[in-house]
Amino acid sequence: MFKPLFRVILLTVLCIFLLSYSEVEEQRVTDMKLLWGAVDIPPKIAADYIHTVIDAHRRFYSQHIVDRLAKTQSLQATEDWAHEGTLLLPDQFLLASSQTANNQGIGMRYRLMSLWPINERNAPKSELEKIGLKAVVDNPKEPFTWIVDKGSSQYFQAIYPDFAVAQSCTSCHNNHAKSPRNNFKMGDVMGGIIINLPLGKRKVSKVDLKVLLPPEVVANYIHSVVASHRHVYSKYIVDRLQDKNILRSTENWLQEKALPLPAQFLMETSQVVRDRRLGLDFRLISLQPINRSNGPANEFERVGLEAVEVHPARPYIGQTRLGGRDIFQAIYPDLAVSQGCIACHNAHPQSPKKDYRMNDVMGGIVVTLYLQ
């Protein structure tokens, strides 16, 4: 009589266990969906991040390199900069950085364009781009965004207003023989910056407006913009002008009326981005920093710096916490690509390491995304 009762009890316990396990597993899957849904990033937010980084570099170069050096050193920015020993015009600097980023083949692309271009390559390439440009000229407070459905793939595109933020911009356009417009003033919308983000293969018959981007993809885009601007600044500004004995880069660049070091160029623009409080940050960090404030801020950054020093071909990524908030971080190797960088670190009295060579890993660029 006990055997049937035992079987009933055993079956009951087994059923309760299976039901409980099913509920736990279902909750675990739900939690994972909520987690990844929370950290994935809408393309509009990703485009805002990218534009903020582009704009910070554009403003700093225009105001603190071009305009400042024109006043303090009589060093001009000219169209034929390569042959005249001068600075690149702000739009040439952005063109060079966008070409560098676009050639990396990561999918994201950006470029400068205008309704009044001096060079036809900067004109809108479609009727929709022209409509978008007109929209941001009329209402510069909001970007013009849309999703393009090309075959089986989708692309998010956004046009942001490009303001006249430096005297060099208005002077060039107002005085250029090929300029269709010659009455620009400071603060005017002179054109737009278009950002193109691939969203992947289309999964439904209609355009999917709810596609999200993984944070590591967005971090890659941001790093691409940062690294491209730094590369152009190091190669075409610092190294070129120093090689020609025109102007040098120094640590005390403001007081000495000189060029900022490439590392300072990055740190100055990162501060501009940080001040806008968008939930985005990028910094230059190192295990052997000249300035201790540029060391790793947490254990994740320390481990990440060690990882990219051993495996510089890929970033070190992960989710952690900072100041009580969930963050996603990606650490990319910072390579010695400029003789100016090497000379500064190897000769600086406070440098812990003095034997850097070209293409050595000198530290890392950490991109931080605050998760909503």
Predicted regions and their residues:
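Short, cysteine/histidine-rich loop/knuckle motifs that typically chelate Zn2+
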Residues: 171, 343
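Bacterial N-terminal signal peptides that target proteins for export
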Residues: 1-9
